[in-house]
Regions:
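Bacterial N-terminal signal peptides
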Residues: 3-18
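Hydrophobic targeting/anchoring helices
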Residues: 23-129
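Alpha-helical scaffolding within the catalytic cores
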Residues: 99-104, 148-150, 358-362
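Helical hinge/lid and interdomain linker segments adjacent to catalytic or ligand-binding clefts
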Residues: 27, 32, 36, 65-76, ...
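Carbohydrate-binding surfaces of carbohydrate-active enzymes
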Residues: 117-118, 131, 140-142, 216, ...
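Extracellular ligand-binding/catalytic regions of CAZymes and related secreted enzymes
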Residues: 25-67, 245, 344-350, 354-423
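Catalytic beta-strand/loop cores that center a nucleophilic Ser/Cys/Thr
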Residues: 129, 136, 233, 244, ...
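Glycine- and acidic-residue-rich phosphate-binding/metal-coordinating active-site segment common to enzymes
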Residues: 245-252, 258-263
C-alpha cells in the first residue's frame, strides 16, 4: 500500500528534486555528473536572477554548482525542466561553505540577470549560431540585434554581447569561392549591400568595419563581449585595419592595399597582434590567426581535444567562472576560425583552454578598457565537422554538453558580483 510519504518521494524523483526536506532553505543545483540537465540549470539560475532572487555560483564545487533560495517557483521550474535540484538545510549549507573555505573553491554572489544581445541577421535560423541554440534551450532571454541597431547606438542597452560567424572584414567569409551562384549567397550579398547603402556606406566592408568599431567602443566603455567562430578573428582584423583596405576587390571593387599588413594598427585590437592577412581571393582564410585553417587544403589541421585550465577560484575568480565544467578535457570542433595561434596572442590574453603540445589555443579571455572580451574558437561544440546545410543540433540530446557549458558560463559571468583580486 502506498502512503502519502511514498507519493512525496516518487514525485520528488519524477521532477528532479532529491532529498526533499520540509525545512530546506536552499536548492543546491549540482553541475557534476549528478546533474540531469546541465544546460537548463543555467536557465534556472537566470530565471531566479530575473525575478530579483540572488544566487551563488560555487566555483569548483561539484562542477560549478549553483546555490539558490528554496522557493516554490524554482522547485516547479526545476521539476518541469528535469533539472537536478537538492533541497538543502542550513546545516548542510554551512558544511558546504566550510568545505569551500578549505579548498580551491569559492562562492560567488550572482546579483542581477544580465541584459543579453546577440548580433545576428534578422532572418537567420537559430541553428546558424550555437549561442542562440543554447540560450533558447536553457530558457535565457536575449534580444537579436544587427547592423542597424548597432549603428543607432543600441549596444548601450546591454551588458553582454555575443557575436558568432559574422565576417567583419566584409568579405562574407569568402563564400564566393564555392557558393557565388547559390540563391542563399546571392540573397546574402544583396541584403548586406542594401543595408550598407541605407546606412550611408559605399560597400559591405565599410559597413562591417563601422560596426566593428562600435563593438570595440562597447567593450572599452565596460561591455562584456563573447565571440565564437569567424567573428573572433575578423573583428580583430577589422579593428586593426581601420582606414586600411583589407578586403579583396570581389567585396568592395578595389584591390587590397599591397602594404596592408604593415599598416595594421594592433594597438587598437583586443586579443591579437602581429598577424598576417591572407590577401589571396582564392584562399578561403582571413589571416594566420587561426591554427586549423579548415577551408584551406594543405593547411587544414586535424581535430584533437582541448584542456581547460584549473584556475584558483579565490585568486582568479573570473577565469575560474569561465571554465566551470564537469569535464576538464573536451573534444575539439571546427569552425571558420577553430583556434588561435599562440604567436598571435597579445601578452595580456589569458588562455582558458589549450590543446596539449599544439601551437594554438581554443579559448581566451582578457580586459579591454573598462570591459572584457572572451573568444571561443569553433562553430558548434556538438557538430565537430560543421558544414553549411547541416541540420540544427538538438540540445535535448546533449543536455550535459561540456562544450556548450562554456558558452553558458559566459552568459552568467556578467551577473557575478566582482571581488577584488587577492594580490
Amino acid at each position: 500500500m502506498m502512503t502519502l510519504g511514498t507519493h512525496v518521494v516518487l514525485l520528488a524523483a519524477a521532477i528532479g528534486l532529491t532529498g526533499v526536506r520540509a525545512d530546506a532553505q536552499h536548492l543546491l543545483v549540482p553541475m557534476d555528473d549528478g546533474q540531469q540537465n546541465h544546460l537548463k540549470a543555467y536557465g534556472l539560475t537566470y530565471t531566479a536572477l530575473k525575478a530579483g532572487i540572488k544566487a551563488e555560483w560555487l566555483l569548483n564545487y561539484r562542477g560549478g554548482a549553483f546555490l539558490l533560495p528554496d522557493t516554490p517557483e524554482l522547485r516547479r521550474r526545476a521539476g518541469l525542466d528535469g533539472i537536478t535540484a537538492q533541497p538543502t538545510d542550513a546545516g548542510a549549507v554551512a558544511a558546504i561553505r566550510a568545505e569551500i573555505a578549505g579548498a580551491n573553491m569559492d562562492a560567488i554572489p550572482l546579483e542581477k540577470a544580465p541584459r543579453v544581445a546577440v548580433y545576428t541577421p534578422p532572418d537567420a535560423p537559430p541553428w546558424d549560431d550555437a549561442v542562440t541554440l543554447a540560450l533558447k534551450y536553457a530558457g535565457i532571454d536575449y534580444v537579436p540585434i544587427y547592423d542597424e541597431e548597432v549603428q543607432r547606438g543600441d549596444l548601450s542597452k546591454y551588458d553582454w554581447l555575443h557575436l558568432h560567424h559574422e565576417d567583419f572584414t566584409g568579405q562574407l567569409n569568402k563564400f564566393h569561392l564555392g557558393y557565388r551562384d547559390t540563391p542563399w549567397f546571392i540573397d546574402l550579398v544583396q541584403k548586406n549591400a542594401a543595408t550598407a547603402r541605407k546606412l550611408g556606406y559605399p560597400n559591405i566592408p565599410a559597413l562591417k568595419k563601422a560596426v566593428a568599431e562600435q563593438i570595440r567602443q562597447f567593450v572599452e566603455r565596460g561591455g562584456m563581449l563573447f565571440a565564437m567562430c569567424g567573428a573572433t578573428e575578423t573583428l580583430e582584423l577589422a579593428i586593426a585595419g581601420a582606414g586600411v583596405d583589407i578586403a579583396g576587390s570581389f567585396a568592395d571593387g578595389t584591390p587590397t592595399d599591397d602594404n596592408a599588413d604593415a599598416k595594421l594598427n594592433w594597438k587598437r585590437s583586443m586579443a591579437f597582434q602581429d598577424a598576417h592577412l591572407e590577401q589571396s581571393p582564392f584562399v578561403n582564410a582571413m589571416s594566420d590567426i587561426d591554427g586549423h585553417q579548415v577551408n584551406v587544403p594543405g593547411r587544414r589541421q586535424p581535430l584533437g581535444a582541448f584542456t581547460l585550465f584549473n584556475f584558483s577560484a579565490k585568486f582568479d575568480p573570473v577565469a575560474a567562472m569561465l571554465v566551470q565544467n564537469q569535464r576538464s578535457v573536451i573534444a575539439d570542433f571546427y569552425g571558420v576560425t577553430t583556434s588561435f595561434n599562440k604567436t598571435a596572442l597579445k601578452p595580456g590574453a589569458t588562455v582558458l583552454a589549450f590543446e596539449e603540445g599544439a601551437p594554438w589555443v581554443k579559448y581566451i579571455h582578457g580586459d579591454y578598457g573598462k570591459g572584457t572580451w572572451t573568444y571561443y574558437g569553433g562553430h558548434d561544440p556538438e557538430d565537430p565537422q560543421h558544414a553549411i546545410g547541416n541540420p540544427p543540433t538538438d540540445l535535448s540530446l546533449h543536455k550535459g554538453s561540456p562544450g556548450y557549458r562554456l558558452i553558458l558560463n559566459n552568459v552568467l559571468f556578467p551577473a557575478a558580483k566582482k571581488k577584488p583580486l587577492k594580490t
